[in-house]
Each structure stands twice: as C-alpha cells, then as structure tokens.
Amino acid sequence: MHKFRIPLKPVSFNQAYRRARKGMMISEKGMKFKEDCSDFLREQYTEEKPLKGKLRVRILYQFRDFREKVDIDNQFKLLLDSMKNIVFDDDSQIYKLSGEKQIGMNRNEIH
C-alpha cells in the first residue's frame, strides 16, 4: 500500500475546468493545482515505475473551514489526473475508488 500526503486545498472540477470551443479545457487554477500535486507525488512515490494492474484508491480530503460547502464527487478528477504516469499509468486501472471528507481540521490536505 502506498500513502501520500498533499498539503493543498483541493480544487473542484468546476474550478479546474472551463468550457472552450472544443469542449472542456483545464483552467489556470486547475493547471497549477495539478502541477503542484504532481510535484508532491513525485517526491513521495519512490518506485521506479508506475503501478500496473487493477488498483483500489482511497482518498481523504481534509478542510479547515466549517463553512466549506464541498461536493466530494467534484474533487476526484483533477487529483487522479495528477497521479497519472507517476503513481499509475492510467486512471482506467482503478476498479475501486472511495473518498471521505473531513471538515474543521487543522489544515487543508489530501491523503
């Protein structure tokens, strides 16, 4: 089992992508989050190659502010995209995905 800690406030799908002529495009905010996540993952993932085969992924989102109105289902896409080619080859390898959110924590983090 691999565990990662990303000390960033998650960016939702709605913040990360915007409509364009040819469909959806990643926003500047989304691109910055994805790059920062990828950097943290590269630091923590010590294997030479991405994982192969079927994967189970559990994600814990921690938020500081009680006033946060967070739809957990909007949080997965950008994070999983940032893991691609670092932790696994493609998110199609994930056969079980679970997530949890905690609000009122000491810091904004993703585990």
What spans do the regions from the language model cover?
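Acidic, proline/glycine-enriched N-terminal capping motif
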Residues: 1-111
